[in-house]
C-alpha cells in the first residue's frame, strides 16, 4: 500500500517545484506524523532519500492532528536563527493503517492526507512572514483517543494485537 513517506515525498516534490527549489538545496526535513512507515528510521530520512535531498538532515515529530503546525513552527525557528535556508515542513498521516473500522465512533473522523511547505527566509514583510504561533496542550484526555500498543508501556506482542491495542 501507500506509505506515509510515499505521500510525504509526493507533497514535498510539489512544494519544491512550486518554489523553484531543487531537492539538493533542502537543508532540513521535518515530518509531523503519528503513522510513520516504521519506528526507525525517521520518516523524514525516508523522504530525504525519495526526493533526493542528499544535503538535508531530518527528524519526525509525533503530534497527531497538529503535526503540520508544529513542523512549521520548528522549521520557522531554524530559518529565523539563520541555521538553515530551505526547510521542508511536512504534515502527513496514513490513518487508514491504524483505524479500527469496527469502531464507528472514531473510524468515520479519520482519513489519509497531508501536505508540505518550503520555509525560507523572507527579504521583506511583503514577501510574507510568520507573525507568531500559539500552542496549547491538555494531556488529561490522553486515555480517550490513544493507541497504547507498541510503545514502552505495552510493547508489541501477539497479545497486544489480539487486544486491538494498535488501533
Describe the role of every protein-language-model region.
Residues 11-27:
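Phosphate/pyrophosphate-binding loops at sites that engage ATP/ADP/AMP, CoA/4′-phosphopantetheine
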Residues 6-16, 107-108, 112-167:
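Hydrophobic pocket-lining "lid/loop/helix" segments that shape and contact the acyl-thioester
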Residues 27-33:
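Short glycine-rich or small-residue beta-strand-to-loop segments that form or flank ligand, phosphate
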